[in-house]
């Protein structure tokens, strides 16, 4: 089981703070979040951490991993 935590606009827009899912690759996580209504565009620009370390959309996951997804910060 993987714990997925959302932060920033991803959390605000989706209303999802945390989900527990079965996944072996980041693609599985992203597919699950799109099924929950988060757009591919919003997910494409997000920062991905696995167990607190920078990761990519091609990363492999292991039971007990914590995936954190954050929307990029913008200002102006």
Label each residue range with its predicted role.
Residues 1-75:
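Ubiquitin-like/PB1-type beta-grasp interaction modules and other compact soluble beta-rich domains
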